[in-house]
């Protein structure tokens, strides 16, 4: 995904709004982060998720569509749709584990059928909404250019240009690491299953399922990167807002000290009118960022619902099987010993759950940044003396406050209208996994006394 990484510097923002300190970015962290971002961008093009004509993820140029990659995405959609039934049938015929009883067959349906359907839906969305996806990218870059023009200090501009911070690059590296870890279980099956060496199509089907999982995860990775960039813009919008309000407060203090000198008072009124204009332009950028946030979330809502259904089921099943093979009396009676922990399965769970965190938490923190804008306006507006405030600045502040008061209802974002992606849904997922895991463990203890 094309993102303007800017100068390789890291930013440290103090708790006091408006103060920014720029420090050098360590080389050892910059190179892995940039490489990971380039790999993610290339993978989205290879799997037909992005049809951009821009070959490099750097730069701030306008993103253009590529007809060749649009056709490539449609071919990927047709291939996944046609090959998915054959892939599941081949896996069902060769993987005897799935045919032992109905419970294991249901597990196979979750792992394979649900995943194949989710991958097909993901490619369908990316094929038929590619123009909207690229439009969101161009609107992000346009908002960045507009916001940068409003930055009237060198520190704010340097901070705006610097996206390659430690936190951002670390998030990119963690995202790529979660993809690698979530491929651990498919790699183990390809390595240990004897049927893989006997039947070539069975091996191809397993690889195909892994690719479908990667397609779903990469689509959500694009969402994470877009929210990361959007959060960067919102944070600097809040910094600029705090700076404007601080300048207005300084003007009021100077106006009160100047007394009744007419020339001085006219100068301060002119400065207030200029700040009112800057505040109005910032409000327009803030409105565009809110619309972008809603558009990006709606584009990835279906994929988020699919992933939030897939991950808890996989985590519950793998945790129970880890317990069953290690501590169940059924295994001890049948084999006389317990099996060691499956570290491939543990890595798979860690990768999936980390990926889930990187889908939910950036959305939650992005909404918190938008809520922070309301607090900044509220705190700054209280310091404005009404008798010396020009009507342009006063009316702009009132309009900004009313807009922020109502905007939460107008731009309410949810995943397909089902739930919000916040820390509450994360705690619900963890609680559901633990509850069903306890039920399965108690069920095993009752059956195998």
Swiss-Prot record:
Residues 51-70, 126-205, 322-340, 444-449 are extracellular. Keywords: Cell membrane, Membrane, Receptor, Transducer, Transmembrane, Transmembrane helix. Residues 1-27, 94-102, 229-298, 364-420 are cytoplasmic. The chain crosses the membrane at residues 28-50, 71-93, 103-125, 206-228, 299-321, 341-363, 421-443. Pfam families: 7tm_7. It is a multi-pass membrane protein. Belongs to the insect chemoreceptor superfamily. Gustatory receptor (GR) family. Gr77a subfamily. PANTHER family: GUSTATORY RECEPTOR FOR SUGAR TASTE 43A-RELATED, INVERTEBRATE GUSTATORY RECEPTOR. This is Putative gustatory receptor 77a. It comes from Drosophila melanogaster. The gene is Gr77a.
């Amino acid at each position: 995904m094309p993102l303007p990484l800017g100068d390789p510097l890291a930013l440290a923002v103090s708790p006091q709004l408006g103060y920014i300190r720029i420090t050098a970015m360590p080389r050892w962290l910059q190179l892995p982060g940039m490489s990971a971002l380039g790999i993610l961008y290339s993978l989205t093009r290879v799997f037909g998720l992005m049809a951009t004509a821009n070959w490099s993820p750097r730069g701030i140029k306008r993103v253009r569509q590529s007809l060749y990659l649009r056709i490539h995405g449609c071919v990927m959609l047709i291939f996944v749709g046609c090959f998915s039934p054959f892939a599941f049938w081949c896996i069902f015929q060769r993987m005897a584990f799935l045919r032992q009883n109905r419970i294991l067959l249901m597990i196979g349906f979750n792992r394979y059928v649900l995943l194949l359907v989710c991958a097909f839906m993901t490619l369908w969305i990316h094929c038929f909404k590619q123009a909207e996806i690229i439009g969101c990218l161009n609107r992000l870059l346009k908002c960045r250019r507009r916001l940068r023009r409003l930055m009237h200090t060198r520190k704010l501009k340097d901070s705006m240009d610097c996206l390659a911070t430690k936190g951002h690059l670390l998030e990119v590296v963690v995202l790529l690491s979660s993809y690698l870890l979530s491929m651990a279980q498919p790699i183990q099956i390809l390595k240990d299953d004897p049927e893989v060496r006997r039947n070539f199509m069975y091996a191809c089907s397993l690889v195909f399922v892994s690719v479908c999982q990667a397609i779903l995860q990469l689509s959500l990775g694009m969402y994470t990167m877009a929210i990361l960039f959007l959060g960067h813009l919102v944070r600097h919008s809040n910094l600029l807002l705090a700076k404007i309000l601080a300048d207005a407060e300084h003007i009021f203090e100077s106006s009160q000290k100047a007394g009744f000198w007419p020339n001085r008072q006219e100068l301060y009124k002119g400065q207030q009118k200029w700040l009112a204009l800057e505040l109005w332009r910032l409000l327009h950028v803030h409105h565009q960022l809110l619309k972008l946030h809603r558009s990006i979330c709606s584009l990835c809502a279906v994929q988020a619902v699919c992933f939030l259904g897939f991950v808890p089921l996989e985590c519950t099943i793998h945790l129970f099987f880890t317990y069953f093979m290690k501590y169940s009396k059924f295994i001890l009676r049948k084999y006389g010993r317990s099996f060691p922990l499956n570290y491939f399965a543990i890595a798979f769970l860690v990768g999936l759950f980390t990926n889930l965190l990187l889908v939910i938490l950036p959305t939650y923190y992005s909404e918190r940044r938008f809520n922070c804008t309301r607090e900044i306006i509220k705190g700054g507006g209280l310091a404005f003396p009404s008798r010396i405030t020009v009507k342009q600045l006063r009316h702009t502040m009132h309009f900004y406050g009313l807009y922020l008061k109502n905007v939460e209802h107008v731009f309410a974002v949810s995943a397909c209208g089902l739930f919000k992606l916040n820390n509450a849904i994360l705690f619900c997922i963890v609680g559901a996994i633990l509850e069903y895991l306890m039920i399965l463990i108690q069920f095993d203890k009752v059956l195998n006394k």
